[in-house]
Amino acid sequence: MLLVNAPVLASERSLTSTISTNPESPDHRNLVSVRAACANGSQVFVSGTLMGIKQTKIVAIDELDLDLKPTSNLLFLRYSDQPGVVGVVGNSLGKLKINIADMQVGRTQVGGKALMALTVDSVIPNDLIQVITKETGATLVRFVNLVSE
């Protein structure tokens, strides 16, 4: 991930970008935050850091803290914190032999808003996304495939 090229890459994709710096980050020496405005009017705020040589981590999405190494295949769920959601997701992926490499769960409070972020070893088909959405009652389920150029 070359952040120096971010404005150029954004411009090439017809995206608007602004860069601001703040020398005060209480938890991380190097922190990059991106706020994206989606076509439907929603926004997402993602923060990442560099922990060491080529050791990037996603450390927050919106107001929820994480510690997740970005890989090629990521799955994100937003849902109300309740027992059983992690099990449903694991079982659903396991039935299709999709291996979970890493998982992080963040929540605002017990029973509050929650975010599950997973790295998996293979692409997740759209029909499985629909099954997970239905069985967990999640308000959002997104599979993200990061491809290096």
Spans of model-derived segments:
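A conserved regulatory-domain signal marking ACT and ACT-like small-molecule sensing domains
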Residues: 1-149
